[in-house]
Amino acid sequence: MRLIKFIILFLFLHSFVYADMNMKIGSKGNESEVSRVIKVVMYDNYYEPSSFKIKVGETIKFEVENAGMLVHEFNIANKMMHKKHQPEMLKMVENEILLVDSIDKKKMKKMAKMDKAMGHSHSNSVLLEPKQKGEIIWKFDNAVNIEVACNVPGHYQVGMIAKVDIN
């Protein structure tokens, strides 16, 4: 009986986590479909604004500026995707691609040939050095539980997360 309970619990939890990891969080948007522009400033370990209200089906252009003194990331994902991405970011630090206040783009390009994740060329994310600007155009296809976060090692853990409310 215990074994059956364990198997049922395992299958339930596994399907819940698997669904979260594979939930469609949206898709790369087209400039011609942009509903509105949201300007975002990244400071050292927080975003301004700290939350976003978005309607299902909206295509948003995020204009992101890093006003902090550290490298920061603006990444649209669910919690499981952030957890999966964090070891990739740690690997970038370990390989001296991602430094405290800069990104070694030559090393990044070289490493990306061996490991695509090291190129950090995700359509849902922008990684910026201090004083840099970038943008993401994202279509929010459905109401899912997502957040914007910085996955530079330690930043997510100290709360560099912005709530995304999709309705």
Regions found by a protein language model. Name each.
Residues 4-14:
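Sec-dependent N-terminal signal peptides
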Residues 20-27, 46, 69-71, 103-112, ...:
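Extracellular/periplasmic metallocenter environments
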Residues 30-60:
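N-terminal edge beta-strand
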Residues 37-39, 61-63, 135-137, 147:
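Beta-strand secondary-structure signal
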Residues 64-68:
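Asparagine-centered strand-capping/turn motif at beta-strand->loop junctions
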Residues 73-77:
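Beta-strand signatures of extracellular beta-sandwich domains
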Residues 78-84, 166-167:
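Short edge-strand/loop segments of extracellular domains
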Residues 87-108:
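Extracellular/luminal beta-rich ligand-recognition
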